[in-house]
A protein has these predicted regions:
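Fungal secretory targeting signals
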Residues: 1-25
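A domain-level signal for the mature, folded cores of soluble proteins
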Residues: 21-159, 174-336
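Short beta-strand micro-motifs enriched in acidic
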Residues: 166-170
């Protein structure tokens, strides 16, 4: 188990007590352990991707918090979003069908060194039995859901996906990859490696995570809906990230430090933003709004062009016992 620093001067404790609000926001623990960074996944984005990794802080500058389609505040930042209710949808100020620059986030395209200008989010959770789950969260400002019979469905503003490496006594044992409403899990040793680190593939538009490149069909019969992956730009989340610890017993986050832009901005931002249990994008549009339509074909599709934005890391079962987010159906694959 990762050690904790428990000693503190009485005077410092008094000072922190007197400043309760900033104390909670700036609570800190140990930095992200080196064994986590050394075994963190690296990911290939699709070579034809159009909606690249985004910085959550930048995303919020284009949002207005709404509940029941009415604004509850004029704006929102990482420092304030954690205080919003679970009924809140962070709603875009712009018409996203016009694909403004913040939606496509081309600035987040990884460079030749595999660094993205958009910080990833790493969340560490200690558990019984020497277990440490390291979650690597990837954020995008837009999800392009795909096409069924050449009709677009499932687009939404905001997109959270994640991978998770489970460590036991500091050794990596398993890898979980989120994809749409589910995901897949593998023993760590069978995963493809790049310089000893697991290599994953992120689908174009939907940003679902897979262990192998190629086509991955899902959700609908007759292979009507498929994700595409290949060895496009490589993304190393450890080069730019915000790091945190999560205590599942108290449901509290604390700052662990980070790297590059994420590490520089994190001290002022704190950890409270991770408490936001609302949606990181627009509520599902009404029919005809922004070209919205819905189609119900029995046994084929019951979906709308635009759906509501997703919840964030706090809703991803961080305290899970099994490796998978959905614990009642978790198979750990021993081959690719």
């Amino acid at each position: 188990m990762v050690g904790r620093t428990l000693t503190a001067l009485p005077a410092l404790l008094c000072a922190l007590t007197a400043a309760a609000t900033p104390t909670a926001r700036l609570a800190k623990r140990d930095p992200v352990p080196s064994f986590v960074l050394q075994n963190a996944p690296v990911s290939h984005l699709w070579s034809q991707e159009q909606w690249w990794p985004a910085d959550v802080a930048e995303h919020l500058t284009h949002m207005v918090p709404e509940a029941d389609f009415s604004a509850v505040a004029q704006g929102v930042t990482l420092e304030t979003v954690g205080g919003l209710g679970s009924d809140v949808f962070l709603t875009s100020k712009d018409d996203v069908t016009k694909q403004p620059a913040w939606v496509t986030s081309a600035v987040g395209t990884p460079d030749a060194s595999a660094k993205s200008a958009a910080p990833a989010t790493i969340v560490l959770v200690e558990k019984d039995g020497g277990i440490l789950d390291a979650f690597f969260f990837y954020f995008y400002s837009f999800d392009h859901g795909g096409k069924v019979l050449d009709i677009e469905f499932g687009d939404h503003v905001g997109d959270w996906e994640h991978s998770m490496v489970r460590f036991v006594n500091g050794a990596p044992t398993t890898l979980y990859l989120s994809a749409h409403s589910g995901g897949s899990a593998y023993t760590f040793d069978v995963t493809e490696k790049t310089n000893g680190r697991p290599t994953t593939y992120i689908a174009g538009g939907t940003h679902a995570n897979y262990a192998t490149p190629g086509q991955h069909c899902h959700d609908l019969p007759l292979n009507l809906l498929c994700d595409q992956t290949d060895a496009g730009p490589l993304w190393d989340p450890t080069l730019n990230f915000r790091g945190f610890w999560f205590d599942s017993a108290t449901s509290t986050f604390s700052v662990a430090g980070g790297a590059d832009v994420g590490g520089q901005e994190e001290p002022a931002e704190g950890a409270s933003w991770l408490n936001f249990a609302g949606a990181w994008g627009d509520e599902q549009y009404k029919i005809l709004e922004h070209g919205q339509y819905c189609i119900d074909i029995p046994d084929v599709v019951d979906e709308c062009k635009f759906v509501s934005g997703p919840t964030g890391p706090i809703a991803k079962n961080l305290g899970r016992t099994a490796v998978c987010q959905k614990e009642d159906s978790c198979t750990i694959e021993t081959s690719l």
